[in-house]
Amino acid sequence: MRVRNVNHIGIIVRSLKDTLITFSELFGLKAGKIIELEQFNVKAAFIPLNEISLELIQPASPNSDAERFIKERGEGLHHICFEVEDIKEAIGELKRKKIKLLSEKPLEGVGGMITFIQPDHTNNALIELMEKIR
């Protein structure tokens, strides 16, 4: 598998609204609209930064994986997303290497098809892989 580049960095927060205000006041950064990602039970906003984006993620319900993440680890860095040429090929290669994934089938993400590598394979860092829609 060959990584093309870093697509985005995910930051998990309690309040998108408050975080967007803070990032605007501190850094002059502006996000697009807040979107609801029902399949992941979160709300998100993307802030473009040249070649990559920041994805701000807010739990959409108290029973979501995102809420559990905040309770266990607090707000902050959630994941790093690497772009790959072919997500199905990347999944196949990782499975052959006995690397566990959160989903063995590509999921539909905001910018393309995605999967996540189980963090115990990557020094406890959550890594998202994405085949970007071209």
Residue ranges and their predicted role:
Residues 1-2, 45-46, 82, 91-134:
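Vicinal oxygen chelate
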Residues 31, 37-39, 44, 55-68, ...:
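Intrinsic, low-complexity N-terminal interaction/targeting segments
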Residues 70-96:
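Short, solvent-exposed interaction modules
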Residues 1-20, 75-84, 133:
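N-terminal beta-strand motif that seeds the catalytic metal site of vicinal oxygen chelate
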